[in-house]
A protein has these predicted regions:
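Terminal alpha-helical segments
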Residues: 3-4, 12-80
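Extended, well-ordered alpha-helical segments in internal regulatory regions
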Residues: 103-107, 142, 161-172, 429-431, ...
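Sequence-level preference for short, compositionally simple segments enriched
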Residues: 2-3, 9, 13-21, 48-50, ...
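Long, hydrophobic, amphipathic alpha-helical segments used as structural scaffolds
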Residues: 105-112, 143-146, 166-173, 198, ...
Length: 540
């Protein structure tokens, strides 16, 4: 099978190529050609501790003037002194944010104790406790980091987690929502200050490097070439009968990947890859053979409603179908909720309804996958690249618009956004495209700085001529919606929205900013022997 980046591919060929992938294709060797560290836009990958500005002495006013919250910044940094090093100010801002978040976490814990175990309010407050705890861990990890891109990703995740906490409380109809929101406001502002200090004071080389012909090339595939640490079979023929049991056996302190093989079968369980389960690699016998279907979680919060929830960093999933349970009600349930950093899905089928993929935070790659969904298909505030995949839009049960992406970037310095690259967007074959033509949009502005880029992709005639949507013109001045070299009946841009924030990219160097190399720094990930030929640049 020719690599996807070497030829034009039709929707039918793309589907065929994904399905014929072998049952347990585990790579045993890789030859890396032209692997060059990714270069992000301003504030991208680079050595944080080695940056010459780290020890520069600056005035506190000069630092805070470059943030969006001057008053909170001055209140937090002024005690350090009128002049100090960037390192000192950054440390103070981080510590101030952690202090505010610790107070909020304790408040969530105390308030949760006042509700019954099955109440949505208690679940939402417990979710907040977890999300704020994760935020504190992210902030504590920033100063030791060597990579500016990693630091920006961590602080961007903090902003996403804070918003997810508040969204959950609002969803639960928590009576003290306004009070909790006010209590979290200071930490939200200080997290933005931390991100601004990193972004404004640790710029990297912005020179656009074209690496379109540089990719990691696999030397060989070998079925069963790597012995899994854990094997799962529903029929009892393997060591474990459930995926949960295999994950519970995760050996903390393991060096390298923890490999789980999931034999063909339908697994009706909700899988959670916990924060402390890093480098988990899970593979199956194919998207139609190994299927995780989940169980009904209607009476829980959005944060908990997912068939597969991956939190531990560097999670990889290949050759598996993931879907929501058939009996899930009108409450949106994600097939995949992903907040694992440097995570990848390869040759997977993700089949859901509303909010099919909840890309909550951090950086992810979906490569050569099928994604089925309806209404709000992909949401969250991650830096997500969907590459060489097929997005199938299904008919809504009610006359509402299909929105393919709802990207939740709320701070202009976050390194997050959704990129659909070299992919195919079509209507479900069981529906006439005419039914969807006036109802399907590439994306919607849901936050002030929402960002979605669709490039080098095939767009079917289901796409509305305007292309993009907004609620009451919200965000149209500041979002980033862009297209580059798309094709197909839905790719015509002459009738697209006339917004200041919508762009048809014409310069190759501008498009390069959104490749897997530049946008999520995929060349630095440990994927050499797992997900097939990795194209990091443009396809044309």
């Amino acid at each position: 099978m020719a690599p996807y980046d070497e030829e034009e591919i039709s929707p039918d060929d793309l589907l065929t190529n994904m399905i014929v992938m072998g049952a347990s294709l585990i790579v045993i060797a890789a030859v890396v050609i032209g692997v060059v560290a990714g270069v992000d836009s301003k504030g991208g990958p680079g050595k944080l501790g080695e940056n010459v500005t780290f020890d520069n002495v600056m005035g506190v006013g000069d630092v805070c003037n470059k943030t969006d919250y001057m008053e909170s910044c001055m209140a937090s940094l002024k005690p350090v002194g009128d002049k100090a090093s960037v390192k000192t100010y950054l440390t103070a801002a981080i510590n101030g944010t952690i202090s505010e978040m610790t107070t909020a976490m304790e408040k969530a814990k105390v308030n949760a104790d006042g509700f019954g175990d099955q109440s949505l309010e208690k679940m939402a407050l417990e979710d907040c406790e977890e999300l704020i705890g994760l935020s504190i861990e992210e902030l504590q990890s920033v100063m030791p980091m060597e990579d500016v891109g990693d630091a920006r990703s961590s602080v961007s995740a903090v902003i996403a987690y804070q918003r997810a906490c508040l969204e959950g409380l609002k969803e639960s109809l928590y009576s003290s929502f306004a009070d909790f929101d006010r209590g979290l406001q200071k930490s939200k502002e200080l997290a933005s200050v931390v991100l601004a200090i990193i972004y404004e004071n640790f710029p990297n080389d912005d020179a656009t490097v074209d690496r379109s012909n540089q990719r990691k090339v696999l030397q060989d595939y070998n079925k069963g070439g790597q012995i899994p640490h854990a094997s799962v079979a529903k029929d009892g023929s393997q060591e474990y009968g459930t995926i949960k049991a295999a994950l519970d056996a995760y050996p903390h302190g393991i060096k390298g990947r923890y490999v789980i093989y999931v034999k063909a079968g339908v697994y009706e369980e909700n899988v959670v890859v916990a924060k402390n389960m890093t480098n988990v690699f899970m593979y199956g016998d194919g998207v139609t053979e190994t299927i995780i279907s989940g169980t009904n979680l209607d009476e829980t919060t959005t944060y908990r409603r997912a068939t597969l929830s991956a939190i531990g960093d560097e999670f990889v999933c290949t050759n598996i179908g993931i879907q929501v349970p058939d009996k899930s009600s009108g409450n949106s349930m994600a097939a995949v909720k992903i907040q694992s950093d440097k995570a990848a899905f390869y040759n997977c089928r993700i089949n859901g309804t509303t909010s099919n993929i909840y890309a909550l935070a951090h950086r992810q790659l979906f490569k050569e996958c099928e994604i089925y969904g309806v209404t709000n298909i992909i949401k969250g505030d991650a830096a997500l690249v969907i590459q060489r995949s097929k997005i199938v839009v299904m008919q809504p049960s009610t006359p509402v618009a299909n929105i393919i992406t709802l990207q939740g970037r709320s701070d202009k310095r976050e390194n997050t956004g959704f990129v659909i690259h070299g992919s195919v967007i079509v209507a479900d074959e069981s529906n006439s495209p005419e039914k969807l033509k006036n109802w399907t949009y590439l994306g919607m502005a849901v936050e002030k700085y929402s960002r979605t880029i669709v490039m080098e992709s095939s767009l079917g005639d289901l796409i509305n001529a305007q292309g993009w949507s907004s609620s009451n013109s919200y965000g149209i001045e500041n979002v980033t919606f862009a297209e580059y070299k798309n094709r197909g009946a839905g790719a015509q841009t002459n009738n697209r929205v006339n917004w200041p924030s919508y762009t048809v990219i014409t310069k190759r160097n501008d498009a390069l900013l959104y490749t897997a190399d530049r946008f999520i720094q995929v060349q630095k990930w440990s994927l050499d022997n797992i997900i097939g030929p990795l194209h990091a640049g443009l396809f044309s």
